[in-house]
Amino acid sequence: MVSTHNRDKPWDTDDIDKWKIEEFKEEDNASGQPFAEESSFMTLFPKYRESYLKTIWNDVTRALDKHNIACVLDLVEGSMTVKTTRKTYDPAIILKARDLIKLLARSVPFPQAVKILQDDMACDVIKIGNFVTNKERFVKRRQRLVGPNGNTLKALELLTKCYILVQGNTVSAMGPFKGLKEVRRVVEDCMKNIHPIYHIKELMIKRELAKRPELANEDWSRFLPMFKKRNVARKKPKKIRNVEKKVYTPFPPAQLPRKVDLEIESGEYFLSKREKQMKKLNEQKEKQMEREIERQEERAKDFIAPEEEAYKPNQN
């Protein structure tokens, strides 16, 4: 067979963007037949998102109807479902619809989440809850990702061209694939105790180097800073003891009560062996109940709804 590799290709000009994703239109479905099987995806959402989802669900339905995707909001089970219909012509739009409901469940506002239906937009939900076992350390590192007044997060958004939302045990990101890769690296390293400022400096240098065409085919590692991890032991503050001089008394200290004396005083001494065991069990159960109530209150703090701006529905 004759090779066509070295032949002239007059249609292949430099102004053609070969990486551009062409929009899939209805006429591109040559057969015109509906899909052989129905595809559907379902995701659960937390209780505090219920009121917000009810207010925006008409807009969600309207946005998905343009792509012939059906959606169902089940407030009893706390779930959102998307599925293809007989009119659906784009085989990949169901995956975009799945990402839409996933972002809505993770507290992403609807005006931002609906952009995922565009071809040039992708998303990534990064789980950060499993990196650190200590709750206080986890909260500290998550706050480090946000930064003072959200400055660290804004810098990352500008450098990666992604929308980033930190919520609970996840970080939701939307943007191009190249930016999402950088966001995941920064977030995971931050939870591994590597400060985001190091990555921000690196991304700023890369952005400046990308403006110079003569460095397009060169290795940039010589321009990037190399940070060494240093574990410096902190000096522990000296404990100052408050030693007060005791007043001298010639009399010996009073004798401490024995265990039997305490039992006689409380009346436990006169109980039978079985009654003592029952009393001990009841005390243990009361302590367990108190601990369980404290744990439930601690867990409930994670499900407090974040402050959101009031959503104004689209009148058009």
Curated annotation (Swiss-Prot):
Keyword rRNA processing found: yes
GO CC, one annotated term: 90S preribosome
Compositional bias (Basic and acidic residues): 279-304
Subcellular location field: Nucleus, Nucleolus
Gene Ontology process terms (BP): endonucleolytic cleavage in ITS1 to separate SSU-rRNA from 5.8S rRNA and LSU-rRNA from tricistronic rRNA transcript (SSU-rRNA, 5.8S rRNA, LSU-rRNA); maturation of SSU-rRNA; ribosomal small subunit biogenesis; rRNA processing
Listed Pfam families: KH_KRR1_1st (PF17903), KH_KRR1_2nd (PF21800)
Region Disordered, annotated ranges: 279-316
Keyword terms, alphabetized: Nucleus, Ribonucleoprotein, Ribosome biogenesis, RNA-binding, rRNA processing
Tagged with keyword Ribonucleoprotein: yes
Phenotype when changing residue 66 to N: In temperature-sensitive mutant KRR1-17; grows normally at 25 degrees Celsius but fails to grow at 35 degrees Celsius
Other remarks in the entry: Present with 4340 molecules/cell in log phase SD medium. Cold-sensitive mutant KRR1-21 is a deletion of amino acids 234-239.
Chain's role: Required for 40S ribosome biogenesis. Involved in nucleolar processing of pre-18S ribosomal RNA and ribosome assembly. Essential for vegetative growth.
Subunit structure: Component of the ribosomal small subunit (SSU) processome composed of at least 40 protein subunits and snoRNA U3. Interacts with snoRNA U3. Interacts with MPP10, KRI1 and with ribosomal proteins RPS1A, RPS4A, RPS4B, RPS8A, RPS8B, RPS11A, RPS11B, RPS13, RPS24, RPS25, RPL4A, RPL7B, RPL8, RPL23, RPL25 and RPL28.
Protein name per the record: KRR1 small subunit processome component
